[in-house]
C-alpha cells in the first residue's frame, strides 16, 4: 500500500519542543515509521527541512517556510503547498492520503 502523510505546518522529523514540534509530530513520525515496515510511506511538509529516504519511508520538504514562523502565519502558504504538492507527486499513486 502507498500512503501519503501530510504534515503541512511542521516537520515531524525536526526536534521535538522546537517551535510547533510536539505531540502531533511525534505521532506522525512514529506511525509513519511503523507503517513503513510493511508499506511505502511518504511524509510531506511545507516547513524547510532536509528531505530523506530510508527504505520504505520517504520524507519530502517542499521548503516553503522557515521553521520559526508562527503556526498562525503559515496559513497564507496553503495554496503554495497544494500547488507544489501536485507538481511534485502523482497523488493518484497513493492508496491513502492522511492529513492532520
Task: Tell where the protein language model's regions lie, with residue ranges.
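A short alpha-helix capping/helix-coil boundary motif
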Residues: 9-12, 65-66, 87-90
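N-terminal subdomain of nucleotide-sugar transferases
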Residues: 1-51
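Short N-terminal targeting/anchoring amphipathic segment
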Residues: 89-100
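Short, surface-exposed alpha-helical recognition segments that flank or form part
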Residues: 19, 23, 72-80, 96
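A generic structural signal for alpha->beta connector loops
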Residues: 38-40, 56, 93
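Surface-exposed alpha-helical segments enriched in charged/polar residues
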Residues: 33, 83-90
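A short, charged, and often flexible helix/loop element on the N-terminal side
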Residues: 57-86
Amino acid at each position: 500500500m502507498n500512503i501519503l502523510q501530510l504534515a503541512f505546518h511542521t516537520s515531524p522529523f525536526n526536534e521535538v519542543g522546537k517551535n510547533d514540534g510536539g505531540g502531533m509530530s511525534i505521532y506522525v513520525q512514529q506511525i509513519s515509521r511503523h507503517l513503513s515496515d510493511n508499506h511505502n510511506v511518504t511524509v510531506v511538509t511545507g516547513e524547510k527541512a532536509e528531505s530523506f529516504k530510508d527504505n520504505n519511508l520517504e520524507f519530502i520538504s517542499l521548503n516553503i517556510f522557515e521553521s520559526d514562523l508562527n503556526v498562525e502565519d503559515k496559513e497564507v502558504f496553503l495554496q503554495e503547498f497544494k500547488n507544489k504538492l501536485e507538481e511534485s507527486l502523482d497523488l493518484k499513486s497513493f492508496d491513502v492520503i492522511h492529513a492532520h
